[in-house]
């Protein structure tokens, strides 16, 4: 979610009550929004993982500059990750290649959800920061997000099996 704090708090509460196992909020929503998200989840009788989205893997440094962020991608991701950690969220969404530089600064049990996973045979599509499944695991990814490589495959089940073999 990415909205005003009151709306995010309610959305996180309702999503939690519906039984989701994980939900995410955009870390650039700010301190009040992150606190509200955590409150919404904590008020629920459920206990989903609450994850903060740092910088989308479809973005690069040029895209950050376009929206007024004039420091490096790595600095922005670390800044957001530290803020997510301060607000006691369970982890972040980031590119797998972003993990190594910030892992020592974050909690040991922090969850790293990583999109932009591609097989060598896959197109990048709109992803700018991609990585193979096996390299994502080596980099420290906790949860891989694999969408189009499977959903747009001629044989989705076979592709999913291929990915699982690569990370086993």
PLM-predicted stretches and their roles:
Residues 98-102, 127-135:
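Short glycine-rich, acidic/polar surface loops and turns
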Residues 115-129, 139, 146:
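Catalytic-face loop-and-helix region of soluble metabolic enzyme cores
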Residues 23, 84, 102, 136, ...:
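Conserved, mostly hydrophobic/aromatic
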Residues 34-40, 137, 150-168:
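C-terminal helical cap(s) of enzyme catalytic domains, especially alpha/beta-barrels
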Residues 1-2, 144:
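Active-site cofactor/substrate anionic-group-binding motifs, chiefly glycine-
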Residues 3-91, 95-99, 105-109, 119-122:
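Conserved anion-binding
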Residues 93, 144-146:
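Short hydrophobic alpha-helical runs that function as membrane-insertion/retention elements
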């Amino acid at each position: 979610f990415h909205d005003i704090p009151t709306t995010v708090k309610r959305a996180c509460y309702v999503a939690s009550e519906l039984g989701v196992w994980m939900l995410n909020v955009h870390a650039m929503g700010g301190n009040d929004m992150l606190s509200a998200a955590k409150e919404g989840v904590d008020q629920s009788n459920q206990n989903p993982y609450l994850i903060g989205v740092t910088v989308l893997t479809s973005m690069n440094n040029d895209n950050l500059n376009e929206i007024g962020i004039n420091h490096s991608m790595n600095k922005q991701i670390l800044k957001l990750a530290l803020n997510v950690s301060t607000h006691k969220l369970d982890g972040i969404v980031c590119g797998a290649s972003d993990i190594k530089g910030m892992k020592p600064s974050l909690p040991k049990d922090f969850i790293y959800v990583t999109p932009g996973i591609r097989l060598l045979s896959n197109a990048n599509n709109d992803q700018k920061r991609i990585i193979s499944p096996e390299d994502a695991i080596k980099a420290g990814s906790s949860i891989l997000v694999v969408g189009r490589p499977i959903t747009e495959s001629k044989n989705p089940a076979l592709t999913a099996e291929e990915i699982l073999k690569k990370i086993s």
